Swiss-Prot record:
The keyword Transferase applies. Substrate binds at residues 23, 135, 354. One of its GO terms (biological process) is biotin biosynthetic process. Keywords: Biotin biosynthesis, Pyridoxal phosphate, Transferase. Its EC number is 2.3.1.47. PANTHER family: 8-AMINO-7-OXONONANOATE SYNTHASE (PTHR13693:SF100), CLASS II AMINOTRANSFERASE/8-AMINO-7-OXONONANOATE SYNTHASE (PTHR13693). Catalyzes the decarboxylative condensation of pimeloyl-[acyl-carrier protein] and L-alanine to produce 8-amino-7-oxononanoate (AON), [acyl-carrier protein], and carbon dioxide. The gene is bioF. Pyridoxal 5'-phosphate binds at residues 110-111, 181, 209, 236. This is 8-amino-7-oxononanoate synthase. It comes from Thiobacillus denitrificans (strain ATCC 25259 / T1). SUPFAM superfamilies: PLP-dependent transferases (SSF53383).
Length: 386
């Protein structure tokens, strides 16, 4: 490594710091939850994606322990060698049934799943049409596919249709977050499906933040989308599900094609079987989780009522557990986040380039594990500081 290369890194790091864009990894001790120990201090956390409070649920912990005793720690091989365990298959079967699709495939992460699906189904002769606010993994997947990459303005279906109509690609795929992670708004699934049918395109929906929460826990698909063979559905499993990984659900022929051709699936060691055991229990808890979801929605309503009318910040329009409080400048968002932390409330600032310039925000996320008092404390403290 040359001194010049390292010097360029030093200059780049200094520039990130000067622009209030340098990031750090807060250090968690103990289990995830509404109240956590971060960097040695006890705080109320409003920044995890553990929407149903399942990450430390005793039933999931017990399921993982039982599988650990019976299966050990690691899978030991890729799925197509000797790492595909009975527990993986049982979870895939249960997941497909729960979300209303014929078949499913388990991946180690959502990022990996997105790379696998897009690159396996779209070639260099294809075209990917993506909402401008999609998750970074969908952007990277489209770029790695080698296909033409067309991004349309957030939620602008007219622009999407004009680009579909102009496309001469052999294969087309519309890709979209289902719940957008930085704004909390929800994609118009049936309208996207209309366009996919009209222009003979796949519709790939990343439901990282809707699965377990929307539609009784089954996620953001409409009944029509569940029945469509052109709709491919992704749920990540480290958020509302409380564990780790991701699962893709689709027509059985799509899933078999991914097994045979998706390089991120083929050339990756399988996830530990104990995670699949915990995920099966998570599905049971999600299915029986009406009370958790009801409590979560009450928290959303209380927060939105309590933080309406702030002078120097505004809540984005969202009915999901993602409640972005838009502040504006990076420095202002950091200042508010740090002031809340001094009061024992953890809500990190989200800055450029994750969100557009001048829309830095506190990304408040709510959980069924929060108490009414936790939410009231957040509302009161934001009013004092914002």
């Amino acid at each position: 490594m040359t001194d010049g290369a390292l010097t360029r890194l030093e200059h780049g790091l200094a520039a990130l710091k000067a622009d209030h864009l340098a990031r750090r990894r807060p250090l968690l001790d103990g289990a995830q939850g509404a109240h956590v120990t971060i960097d040695g201090r006890r705080v109320v956390s409003f920044c995890s994606n553990d929407y149903l409070g399942l990450a430390n649920d005793p039933a999931l912990v017990a399921a993982a322990h039982a599988a650990l005793d019976g299966c050990g720690v690691g899978a030991g091989a890729a799925h197509l060698i000797s790492g595909h365990h009975r527990l993986h298959l049982e979870f895939e079967t249960d997941f497909a049934q729960w979300v209303g699709k014929p078949a499913a495939l388990l991946f180690s992460t959502g990022y990996l799943a997105n790379l696998a699906v897009v690159t396996a189904l779209i070639s260099r002769r294809g075209e990917v049409f993506a909402d401008k606010l999609n998750h970074a993994s969908l952007v990277d997947a489209a770029k790695l596919s080698g296909a033409r990459f067309s991004r349309y303005r957030h939620g602008d279906l007219a622009q999407l249709e004009s680009r579909l109509a102009a496309s001469t690609a052999r294969d087309r795929m519309i890709v979209s977050d289902l719940v957008f992670s930085m704004d909390g708004d929800v994609a118009p699934v049936d309208a996207l499906l209309d366009l996919a049918e009209r222009y003979d395109a796949w519709l790939y929906l990343d439901d990282a933040h809707g699965f377990g929460v929307l539609n009784g826990g089954r996620g953001g698909l409409s009944e029509r989308a569940r029945a469509s063979t052109r709709v491919i559905y992704l749920a990540t499993l480290g958020k509302a599900a409380g564990v780790a990984g991701a699962s893709v659900a689709a027509d059985g022929r799509v899933i078999e094609w991914l097994i045979q051709t998706a390089r991120p699936y083929i050339y990756t060691t399988a996830a530990p079987p104990l995670l699949a055991a915990a995920l099966r229990e998570s599905l049971r808890q999600i299915a029986a989780g009406a009370a958790r979801r009801g409590r979560l929605q009450r928290h959303v309503a209380r927060l939105r009522s309590g933080l309406g009318g702030l002078k120097n910040a505004v809540l984005a329009d969202s009915f999901t557990p993602i409640q972005p409080l838009i502040v504006g400048a990076n420095a202002d968002a950091l200042t508010l986040s740090q002031a809340l932390l001094q009061r024992g409330i953890l809500v990190p600032a989200i800055r450029t380039p994750t969100v557009p310039a001048n829309t830095a925000r506190l990304r408040i996320t709510l959980s069924a594990a929060h108490s009414d008092a936790d939410v009231a404390r957040l509302v009161e403290t934001v009013h004092e500081l914002a």
